Curated annotation (Swiss-Prot):
It comes from Shewanella frigidimarina (strain NCIMB 400). The gene is thiI. Belongs to the ThiI family. Gene3D superfamilies: 3.30.2130.30, HUPs, Rhodanese-like domain. This is tRNA sulfurtransferase. Its EC number is 2.8.1.4. The keyword DNA-binding does not apply.
Amino acid sequence: MKFIVKLYPEIMMKSKSVRMRFTKMLETNIRNVLKNVDEGAKVQRLYDRIIVQVPSDKPELCDVFADRLACIPGIAHVVQVSEYSFDSIDHIYQQALPKYRDEIAGKTFCVRVKRSGNHDFNSIDVERYVGGGLNQHTEALGVKLKDPDVTVNLEINQDKLYMVERRIQGLGGFPMATQEDVLSLISGGFDSGVSSFQFIKKGARTHYCFFNLGGAQHEIGVKQVAYHLWKKYGESHKVRFVSVPFEPVVEEILERIDNGQMGVVLKRVMMRAATRIADKYGIQALVTGESLGQVSSQTLTNLNVIDRSTDLLILRPLIAMDKQDIINQSRIIGTEDFAKSIPEYCGVISQKPTVKAVLSKVEAEELKFSEDLIDRVVASAVVMDIRDIEAEMNQQVTETETVKDVASGEIIIDVRAPEEEERSPLLIDNVMVKAIPFFKLATQFADLDKSKTYLLYCDRGVMSKLQALYLVEQGYTNVKVYRP
């Protein structure tokens, strides 16, 4: 079984040299992602497409490959195909007949062909010949060119015939690392998750900077969001997760800064701290989830004052999006339920925030602030490769027991994503297994029977351990990690 990866149209519009560079990078990215699924995956780059070969002895990997390819930036769509050789137009029909005979029985159909290469026929010739043959020699209701029940999709490339099994919509955008790196200021809320995704999709290697205002529980929740975004959409490249202990900064702002200016000052201090981190790693821009008028600090006047705190470019991909549109996007990318369970800390420090900050007044207030405190908190920041979150979880799950056997009365919660759980459901004799995806567990766990003990399960143990840590931080003691 093969997949034909079609490049995003914007890539095809580039000059030859740029298109070749982008295509090479996409090929490498696909290989990096799929080798984590199976080392036997083969990836071949052609002029306008990339061919992915599923190991012939592992057809069960088709669905996994399809899921991964659908989330790699730079892909317009993917078609899963069966490959055949042919020597004539009749040979094409003879191979299509047994393939589609049962599928089109009792239904209307049409044939659509895409062809490239040198042949003594064109695409329309094939559509007519194959369509006519299927119409005469099957029990189909007939040909219907508009809105048929079944569309027979064929692709021809030189002497190869590809019968399309299914079409998978791609992510679009540009291949990862075709653009410069960015540093996303992530809080775990709706906005920062979506803004991070937007730059991953656009081909920028997106690192994460987290200003910790809420302790270990807050950090665990944000790490889940960042790890999810990286694992699902950016796994081809390693990125950094930087955690900055910002409680001392908030404490000093509360003590020294005028109440109305607190929100703007906090954002300016965050930008200066993030700039220091970005400069250290050669990152050229900051990304925030700010949206015009959403909160008091996000008026044009205040955003202008915030921008004056740094010379580094600040990018705001959500600036004109409505809140509901942002929430809808977070639902699509899988961060909505994370965001629901993570409180917004920045908004609680200013009771009467200004919406028209004056730069001179803000700068005067900042004279009360210890500038070297920024250097101290940045120096104490914890920087980690996001891939090491798994190892960190293995070390930190000390308060949560890890078990390989299920005791009487214990319930397993399968926290895998729905498509993974459906593909290979966890079935254990005489044991209740509840399927609650990891991104819903934080909001649904409180509704479960508190007298029961719950064992969290996922394939690799990363999300189950993250969720266990998060629940322990919330005060739950009836949770363990299940690693059979």
